[in-house]
């Protein structure tokens, strides 16, 4: 399934871009599902896929309902513990949605579309309206992060020892985690794995919406770094609300000139690898299918499905006795600056922080037998140098 995720700085028109992309895909003959958290004028707002045209369905995420359903289910599964401590139950009507629940609801919706009940509906294209730019990139990194937390907190080897739990509980003097907790963790891990596979698929791309101007230029520069760190792929940058050039009105002419200068920078920085599409200002917010068609947003291109390659690579220098003299782990980070870069080696992992973005990367087996000897950020590429540890690296006789 071809998947397009739309985002951009707040107020830049990412929801409009999602709707225009979905309509273009449907018009191109693709059976399309459009997912949004915000209402879209002229489209039905049901929480189950509802037909818009013959080839286009739309569904709106209800994060409040998802939060209430999840918490109610958790209460039922933990009823034994709650009864033990004399805790009362919370009714669905009294539950108030907590911060962060919208992100979890979106991940749940992505799972339904990728591997859940909606995945059997025969959709060719999935278009998802994501939150604003920085929040969206953090959201797409969340499945990998949450799965790591689950592995650390509830490792599989402990679940395998469930027959020893009563004995261990007596020895430790504290109750061991109940079976339902491991089962719940396994279900969530499977759900997160499906979403992570969708994000990492080479047929999944991002489309960025931004209104030309200094603020958007800085936001996109930061976003390029986040895209590279997380290994995400963008297929289009839409410059939204582009004013007509050569206006006789001095005020409009000045605004258009500022936009044109910014557009020149975007074409130089993003194209041709990522095309820049200029969507005209309609003089009003797009509200109809004709308005969306007037933006002339292209339909998604065809891409082969399968896990995309990791964004990093390893370079090596030959040494003696079959042991390399040095290995260099390389990761492109366009737009990154040294002052905002933090790198920590911890065991088999690299902890990378670049500006507002953070990622923990498990290094290749060869690098686990090495020590870090240095790092440098040059020409937009982070290079981490590893020196083989003689005590761990096998020697050739």
Predicted ranges, named:
Residues 383-385:
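Short C-terminal beta-strand
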Residues 5-64, 113, 126-148:
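Walker A/P-loop NTP-binding active-site region of P-loop NTPases
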Residues 164, 192-338, 347-351, 355-371, ...:
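C-terminal lobe/tail of nucleotide-utilizing enzymes
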Residues 39-41, 45-94, 101-104:
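P-loop NTPase motor core
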Residues 39-41, 64-66, 132-135, 155, ...:
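Conserved nucleotide-binding/hydrolysis micro-motifs of P-loop NTPases
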Residues 1-3:
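Extreme N-terminal starter segment of soluble prokaryotic enzymes
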Residues 82-222:
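Phosphate/Mg2+-binding loops and adjacent switch elements
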Residues 344-346, 378-380:
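Structural motif
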């Amino acid at each position: 399934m071809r998947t397009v995720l739309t985002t951009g700085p707040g107020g830049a028109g990412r929801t409009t871009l999602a709707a225009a992309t979905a309509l273009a895909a449907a018009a191109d003959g693709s059976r399309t599902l459009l997912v949004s958290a915000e209402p879209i004028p002229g489209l039905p707002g049901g929480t189950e896929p509802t037909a818009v045209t013959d080839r286009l369905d739309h569904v709106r995420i209800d994060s409040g309902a998802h939060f209430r359903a999840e918490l109610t289910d958790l209460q039922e599964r933990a009823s034994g513990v709650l009864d033990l401590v004399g805790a009362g139950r919370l009714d669905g009507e009294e539950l108030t949605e907590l911060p962060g629940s919208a992100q979890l609801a979106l991940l749940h919706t992505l799972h339904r579309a990728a591997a859940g009940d909606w995945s059997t509906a025969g959709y060719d294209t999935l278009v998802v309206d994501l939150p604003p730019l920085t929040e969206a990139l953090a959201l797409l990194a969340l499945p990998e992060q949450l799965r790591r937390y689950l592995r650390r907190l509830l490792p599989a080897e402990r679940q395998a020892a469930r027959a020893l739990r009563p004995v261990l509980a007596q020895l430790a003097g504290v109750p061991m985690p109940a079976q339902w907790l491991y089962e719940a963790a396994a279900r969530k891990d499977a759900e997160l794995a499906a979403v992570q596979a969708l994000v990492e698929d080479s047929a999944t791309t991002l489309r960025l919406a931004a209104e030309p101007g200094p603020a958007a230029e800085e936001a996109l520069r930061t976003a390029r770094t986040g895209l590279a760190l997380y290994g995400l792929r963008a297929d289009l940058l839409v410059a939204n609300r582009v004013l007509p050039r050569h206006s006789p009105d001095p005020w409009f002419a000045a605004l258009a000139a500022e936009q044109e200068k910014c557009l020149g920078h975007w074409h130089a920085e993003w194209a041709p690898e990522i095309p820049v599409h200029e969507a005209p200002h309609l003089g009003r917010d797009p509200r109809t299918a004709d308005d969306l068609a007037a933006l002339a947003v292209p339909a998604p291109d065809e891409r082969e499905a399968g896990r995309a390659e990791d964004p990093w690579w390893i370079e090596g220098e030959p040494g003696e006795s079959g042991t390399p003299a040095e290995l260099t782990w390389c990761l492109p980070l366009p737009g990154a600056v040294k002052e905002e870069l933090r790198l920590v080696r911890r065991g088999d992992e690299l902890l990378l922080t670049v500006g507002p973005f953070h990622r923990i990367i498990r290094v290749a087996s060869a690098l686990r037998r090495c020590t870090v000897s240095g790092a440098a950020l040059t020409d937009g590429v982070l290079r981490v140098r590893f020196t083989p540890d003689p005590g761990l690296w096998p020697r050739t006789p």
